[in-house]
């Protein structure tokens, strides 16, 4: 069903109702201003010239130089054949955080269409060979590449797997169910531990929405799986049975470490955009582990580790999800979700058992819902977006507690990353031309709370987010 579209809507109300709305808005504004006075403000730490090499959310942070400091890699993309189905990296640029280009593959473009793509580019930063320096693992021109993080030189390369003729007609998520190329054009990439090694050394690549391929660190294919249900954007690797090997949640299907299907959720439509593992800390399921998933028009889903649905909230096209300690006075980790209708969405907030507490609409697109360790006292804030008035961070009650300064910073993208100093997060905003990095306006602190969060080496625009006291899987 396609929702009705309107060119213009005029909403009227009585004078008394309008006065009540204005009073509520003023009360909310006063409550936000009072809260903001109690927390550190954003202080501009660095302004970086990206020299025309910027992008959308195709940004990765890591330790390319092995000196304990962060560097970053940005990928620009080229779209091919059909919309976002076969995007490929056209320019890959490594920077230090002073804005110096360390190396570059390809040529940058001023076409801003490079940043508006509904897919990940295949790219992660990770020390996959254990030499103490992060490599850049990527794919381009139907090859998987392991690049030296310091120089960009190729350390290993291998052709991507063939898309076999036998699979044509059964491939989901591509026009006419026929793949456009002889070899797979990777749509995303994840570091996994299917072999149960001392550290993750396996690489997962996937096509748009149907097939996943597990590679070892020599770029040899160990197994592949063709899904009967949409794979979603970023499958989640996790050891759910304690055997030391990662299993893989591919959309609604759970695979074992050899790529065999273990179970499937009783959902067939649309696809999972983001997945976050959780553990109930209270209520009837206390101690049980679960997956919190946003699944497009299927809404917000919570399943146990056997695929049984425990909760399903039909909130519309559910798009993003995060779990963190947003309300320290309540048990467990609260959940926040946003939906997406091609523009602004509604933010939904749930307690740790998946019961909805409140909802709000800030009329802006691209709400991240990233947990931010801003104060270092164990409470997480929710990063929305980089808008000065309606962005910034809110707390678990929906109160705007930290605002962005009105300093001309880029507003296309934002992220929370612990880049400097103590264990508290910095806030990064960027577009195609510049990057701003903010930190707290107070002094670095000792003995700051350091949560367990998603590792840098598995970055994605579709990964969901979590911030826990400890790793429990």
Feature names for model-found ranges:
Residues 2-473:
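Beta-propeller-forming repeat regions
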């Amino acid at each position: 069903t396609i929702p009705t579209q309107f060119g213009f809507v005029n909403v009227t109300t009585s004078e008394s109702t309008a006065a009540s709305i204005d009073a509520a808005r003023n009360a909310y504004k006063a409550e936000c201003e009072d809260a903001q006075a109690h927390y550190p403000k954003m202080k501009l730490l660095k302004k970086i010239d990206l020299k025309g090499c910027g992008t959308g959310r195709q940004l990765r942070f890591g330790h390319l130089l092995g000196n304990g400091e962060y560097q970053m890699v940005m990928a620009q993309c080229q779209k091919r054949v059909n919309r976002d189905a076969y995007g490929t990296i056209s320019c890959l640029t490594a920077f230090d955080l002073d804005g110096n280009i360390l190396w570059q593959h390809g040529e940058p473009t001023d076409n801003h269409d490079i940043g508006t793509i509904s897919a990940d580019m295949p790219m992660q930063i990770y020390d996959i060979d254990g030499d103490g320096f992060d490599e850049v693992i990527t794919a381009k021109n139907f090859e998987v590449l392991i690049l030296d993080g310091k120089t960009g030189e190729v350390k290993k390369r291998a052709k991507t797997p063939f898309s076999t003729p036998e699979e044509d007609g059964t491939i989901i998520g591509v026009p006419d169910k026929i793949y456009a190329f002889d070899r797979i054009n990777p749509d995303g990439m994840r570091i996994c531990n299917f072999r149960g090694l001392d550290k993750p050394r396996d690489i997962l690549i996937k096509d748009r929405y149907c097939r996943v391929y597990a590679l070892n660190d020599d770029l040899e294919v160990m197994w592949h799986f063709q899904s009967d249900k949409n794979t979603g954007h970023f499958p989640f690797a996790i050891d759910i049975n304690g055997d030391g090997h990662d299993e893989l949640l591919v959309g609604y299907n759970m695979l074992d470490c050899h790529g065999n299907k273990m179970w499937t959720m009783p959902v067939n439509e649309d696809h999972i955009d983001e997945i976050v593992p959780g553990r109930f800390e209270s209520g009837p399921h206390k101690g049980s582990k679960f997956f919190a998933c946003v699944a497009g028009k299927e809404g917000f889903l919570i399943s146990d580790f056997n695929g049984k649905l425990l909760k399903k909230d039909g909130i519309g096209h559910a798009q993003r999800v995060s779990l963190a300690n947003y309300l320290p006075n309540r048990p467990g980790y609260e959940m926040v979700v946003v939906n997406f209708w091609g523009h602004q969405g509604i933010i939904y907030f749930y307690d740790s058992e998946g019961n909805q507490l409140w909802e709000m609409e800030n009329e802006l697109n691209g709400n991240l819902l990233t947990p931010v360790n801003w104060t270092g006292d164990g409470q997480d804030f929710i990063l929305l977006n980089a808008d000065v008035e309606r962005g910034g961070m809110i707390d678990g009650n929906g109160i705007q507690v930290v605002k962005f300064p009105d300093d001309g910073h880029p507003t296309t993208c934002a992220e929370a990353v612990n880049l400097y100093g103590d264990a508290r997060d910095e806030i990064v905003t960027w577009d195609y031309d510049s990057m701003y990095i903010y930190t707290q306006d107070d002094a670095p602190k000792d003995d700051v709370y350091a949560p367990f969060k998603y590792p840098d080496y598995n970055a994605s625009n579709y990964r969901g987010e979590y911030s826990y006291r400890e790793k429990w899987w």
